[in-house]
């Protein structure tokens, strides 16, 4: 994973990372400086992906930091072009690029209309997610999801301060709500182990010894 934290310092990144974990994955990379779209960003990302071929996700935080403006007087065309450049790069290298972007301060009946900029941004992406807090600092929010290959969903979330994660507060409509008890036991067991190396048979034996 490559995370472009373009609004943070390395000290702030380190502080936040230590709040989440004491053992960050070796495959997690950070950068605080990047060129703009059409001004070297594509080459920088391509070089990184060549050096780290196992990369599957690039996070750009925020989108505005890599935009360079245009002489064109068509904002929609500018927005669509910028996103299309990044999408082409993602498709070429078979990775996902997650763009963090600001919302308008004005509410809208359609959450997707709250994405700052024109509809050229949401129109060029594969998927769009809008996280809208019930009120600032409440820790309660709804994640609105839409995309070309996913159904529209509204997911109620609550922020878990102990793990610095957003958690789903109720089952997603239409999904299976009953979970195999053995799957629950296995999940809890693996969380307790932290990590495991071995065969499926060895894992099964450990689980049986633990649960009886």
Regions found by a protein language model. Name each.
Residues 1-88, 148, 161-164, 169, ...:
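Conserved inter-motif catalytic segment of the P-loop NTP-binding fold
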Residues 4, 57, 77-165:
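Phosphate-binding/switch region of NTP-binding enzymes
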Residues 16, 20-23, 66-69, 89, ...:
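Conserved, well-folded catalytic cores of nucleic-acid-processing
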Residues 28-30, 45, 143, 157, ...:
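Hydrophobic beta-strand residues in large extracellular and virion-surface proteins
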Residues 157-212:
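DNA transaction DNA-binding modules
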